[in-house]
From Swiss-Prot:
This is F-box/kelch-repeat protein At3g08810. It comes from the Eukaryota. Residues 1-15 have a biased composition (Basic residues). It holds the Pfam family Kelch_FKB95. Kelch repeats lie at residues 134-181, 183-224, 225-271. It comes from Arabidopsis thaliana. Residues 1-25 are annotated as: Disordered. Keywords: Kelch repeat, Repeat. InterPro entries: F-box-like_dom_sf, F-box/kelch-repeat_ARATH, F-box_dom, Kelch-typ_b-propeller, Kelch_2.
Length: 343
């Protein structure tokens, strides 16, 4: 007696069909239109999907589409110094994944490494300034006292460095800043105190113009200071203050109850983050260790006016929107600069 042939069941351990990395089947122009509507915080994650995604996310056409659709946004960049040079990172969203209870309390932000072909040139904190989608490195020599006239630009769209027109003269003790929406460089052309010079970059003409009548007192703000909506803020020994121009004195920034205490010797940097204050610092381990964390807090600012004995009194309150660990690095890494570009 013959039995009908049974279909052989696939073994539970049989090798599954090979699958390739998903390749986008949509035309590039459609993908660009979609990417232009996605927050740039997700771009580092999207760039890992495929090589074509990575190419589209770095294309000039994408940022033209973002500009035309009104989807430009601010992007926070962080520069760190290590033994082999300088490394750049950008604020991004963590990929969606199954999270533990502790991870659910996280802000969801992290610092993603910015791949820069050829690496980064030598930079200093005072030599860097962000204008639009570019970060300018003005006379960024390693030795602060050495003179230089070189200028290079980091294009935050393609993440590539390019050379820019040099300053007309070499400057030492250089400091870069933004004044009236224009990038500038200022410093001393020689050892004399009266040799302080200020230059502003004319992007249309591609040249540096010498500005007369501006003294050194108008500049030289360290990274523990920042200006937000024409108000100066500072931090020293963990105390945040703002300058009241009406009474000409510094006042304490109130609130900030959720802000943790900084470790002794921490480098704290402030930045204008779209009208809010971004605070980044390196948190050293409580016990001697080989790693430390780069932490960040974003603070919303609110001006409040009250009257005390018929006298007007202004105060500014800060509300911590989120605070989190963004990156773990060796203790030998130094926090150099925090910049905010518009893309």
């Amino acid at each position: 007696m013959s039995y009908p042939e049974r279909k052989r069941k696939r073994s539970r351990w049989s090798k599954p069909h090979s699958t390739q990395n998903p390749s986008p089947s949509l035309p590039d122009d459609v993908l660009l239109s979609i990417f232009a509507r996605v927050s740039r915080l997700y771009y580092p994650t999207l760039s890992h999907v495929s090589e074509s995604f990575r190419s589209l996310l770095a294309s000039p056409e994408l940022y033209k589409a973002r500009s035309l659709s009104g989807n430009t946004e601010i992007c926070l960049y962080v520069c760190l110094r290590c033994s082999t040079g300088y490394r750049w990172f950008s604020l991004s969203r963590k990929p969606d994944q199954t999270l533990t209870y502790e991870e659910r309390k996280s802000s969801g932000y992290a610092l993603a490494r910015v791949p820069i072909p050829g690496g980064s040139p030598n930079v200093r904190s005072s030599s860097l300034v962000a204008v639009g989608s570019d970060i300018y490195n003005i006379c960024g020599s390693i030795n602060k006292a050495s003179s230089s006239s070189s200028v290079s630009i980091l294009d935050c769209q393609s993440h590539t460095w390019r050379e820019a027109p040099s300053l007309p003269v070499e400057l030492s003790s250089i400091s870069a800043s933004v004044r009236d929406g224009n990038q500038g460089g200022h410093g001393y052309s020689d050892s004399r105190k009266n040799s302080f010079k200020v230059f502003a970059y004319n992007s249309k003409e591609g040249r540096w113009d010498h500005l007369v009548g501006l003294g050194a007192g108008s500049f030289m703000l360290p990274d523990s200071y920042c200006v937000i909506d024409n108000v100066s803020y500072s931090v020293s020994d963990g105390m945040f203050r703002w300058y009241d121009t009406e009474v000409r004195r510094w006042k304490d920034l109130r609130g900030l109850f959720q802000l943790p205490k900084f470790s002794a010797g921490a480098c704290v940097i402030l930045a204008d983050y779209g009208g809010k204050m971004a605070v980044l610092w390196d948190q050293l381990p409580y016990h001697h260790g080989f790693h430390k964390t780069i932490q960040c807090a974003v603070i919303a600012l609110e001006r409040r006016t009250s009257f005390v004995f018929r006298e007007k009194s202004c105060q500014i309150w800060g509300k911590v929107e989120w605070v989190d660990d963004l990156l773990t690095v060796p203790t030998s890494y130094d926090l150099v600069k925090v910049l905010v570009a518009t893309l």
